[in-house]
């Protein structure tokens, strides 16, 4: 059974382990450098009151996914940026759907009007996930250079609240 709840400081190390496994696997995130729990904790607390973080946990309270929304300098104030990460080997089990139910409600409560997702064009699973949640394509970034020098295209998707 998967439960979703707001992320707390004690989740940061587990979230970092989950994210680092995704980064090491490659191919789905634009992140290329491993993160620490302290890095994520800093990001969780560095918001302007317009961010929210949720974790999905199994029956043993182990983090199996997490999602956040936050404002972003490149977006208008009524838009939030979203990021979703599910444990390697656990995709397609409804974890992302449960996370988005909580995140969507929080985004509305925070006053956002729409949510932006930047997805690598070669991340088929991510594209399918956001499409299945009702996100619509609205743009594309060609030739995005990631921190490791790799060049990818990004699909921009939008969810109107």
Annotate each predicted stretch with a short phrase.
Residues 84, 148-161:
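Terminal substrate-recognition subdomain of acyl/acetyltransferases
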Residues 6-9, 28, 32-89, 100-102, ...:
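Acetyl-CoA-dependent GNAT
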Residues 15, 19, 40:
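Hydrophobic pocket/interface hotspot
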Residues 92-109, 128-132:
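Conserved acetyl-CoA-binding loop-helix of GNAT-fold acetyltransferases
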Residues 107-119:
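Conserved GNAT acetyl-CoA-binding A-motif
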């Amino acid at each position: 059974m998967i439960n979703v709840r707001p992320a707390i400081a004690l989740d940061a190390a587990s979230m970092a382990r989950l994210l680092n496994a995704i980064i090491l696997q490659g191919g789905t995130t634009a992140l290329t450098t491993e993160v620490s729990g302290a890095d994520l904790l800093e990001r969780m607390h560095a918001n302007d009151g317009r961010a929210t973080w949720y974790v999905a946990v199994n029956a043993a309270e182990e983090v199996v996914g997490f999602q956040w929304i936050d404002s972003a300098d490149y977006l208008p104030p009524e838009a939030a940026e979203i990021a979703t990460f599910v444990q390697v080997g656990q995709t397609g089990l409804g974890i992302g759907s449960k996370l988005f139910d909580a995140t969507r409600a929080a985004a509305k409560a925070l006053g956002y009007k729409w949510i932006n997702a930047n997805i690598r064009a070669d991340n088929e699973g991510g594209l399918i996930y956001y499409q299945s949640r009702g996100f619509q394509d609205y743009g594309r970034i060609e030739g995005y250079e990631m921190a490791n020098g790799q060049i990818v295209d990004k699909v921009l998707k939008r969810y109107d609240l």
